Design a protein with these regions (language model features):
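Charged docking surfaces used in two-component/phosphorelay signaling
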Residues: 16-24
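Acidic, metal-coordinating helix/loop segments flanking the phosphotransfer/catalytic sites
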Residues: 31-51, 94
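Active-site residues of response regulator receiver
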Residues: 55, 85
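Receiver (REC) domain active-site loop signature in two-component systems and cognate sites
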Residues: 58
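Short, glycine/charged-rich "phosphate-handling" switch motifs in NTP-dependent
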Residues: 102
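C-terminal output helix
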Residues: 109-118
Length: 123
């Protein structure tokens, strides 16, 4: 059965590129435009989500807040969460790790690298 990934990013073009890349590799993708929508879709689809991929800088709820909120929910305590963001400072990466991020990818991203990381994390 195909694995399901929640992709959260306020940039429509980034979401579309991420979704296209992942769908072409056989993954099912649920898209959300910000952390609030991402949280709602995560809760509604908790039983099928295998990975969350989130941006950091978004309106309404940023990526770190989304990660912390998801990690507080029993159904997402062990779900891999990857940050896909323009933020590349060591301080921000440490904040991401402290919040519960599994890994970090920097935009702009190479679609092949994205697939490589996703396959390593969830198969």
């Amino acid at each position: 059965m195909a694995k399901t990934i929640l992709a959260v990013d306020d940039s429509t073009s980034i979401r579309q590129m991420v979704a296209f890349t992942l769908k072409s590799a056989g993954y099912i993708v649920i898209e959300a435009a910000d952390g609030v929508e991402g949280l709602a879709k995560a809760k509604a689809n908790a039983h099928v989500i295998n990975l969350v991929l989130t941006d950091q800088n978004m309106p309404n709820m940023d990526g770190l807040t989304l990660i912390k909120t998801l990690r507080s929910l029993p159904e997402f305590s062990a779900t891999p969460i990857l940050m896909l963001t323009t933020e590349s400072s060591d301080a921000m990466k440490m904040q991401g790790k402290a919040a519960g991020a599994t890994g970090w990818l920097v935009k702009p991203f190479d679609p092949h690298k994205l697939l490589e990381v996703v396959k390593k994390v969830i198969g």
